[in-house]
Amino acid sequence: MRRFDAVIAGAGAAGMFCAVQLGWRGKSVAVIEHSGCQGRKLMITGKGRCNVTNNCTADTVMKNIPRNSKFMYSALSRFAPEDVMSFFECLGVELKTERGNRVFPVSDNAKDIVKALVKACEDSGVQFIDCLLYTSPSPRD
């Protein structure tokens, strides 16, 4: 049985982003997805256009979070909206900013975001595992 440095539950935006980051750092990664479709929920964000982020500072994002904005501070201080945009542009996705500073792929198609994430995962050696094939984790010896 193959062992991985990391096993991620869910091939959504966060799961695939995390998998790519780990893969780029030379870690062996498996992503377990129960629906058999990577990025399924991403396909419907922004009415199928995928609102990637907002083109503003992390401080502006924090000011617009109605409750418990301190919860987001740690994440935003490490990976701000401009980092999100750079990440997707690095993957070859052209982005545009629309009214309200909302950022979308130039194609206006969420599929391009999903394809870029899946390709980045595959290129960095991430293995996708269908949940139906997965039985249970085993503790390390």
What are the roles of these predicted feature ranges?
Residues 73-79, 101-118:
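Short beta-strand to alpha-helix junction loop
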Residues 124-132:
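A conserved beta-strand/loop element that lines the FAD pocket in flavoprotein oxidoreductases
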Residues 24-42:
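Glycine-rich FAD pyrophosphate-binding loop
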Residues 49-95:
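Glycine-rich active-site loop/strand segments that organize a redox cofactor
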Residues 134-141:
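Conserved small/polar residues in nucleotide/adenosyl-binding loops
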Residues 6-30:
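N-terminal Rossmann-like FAD-binding beta1-loop-alpha1 element of flavoenzymes
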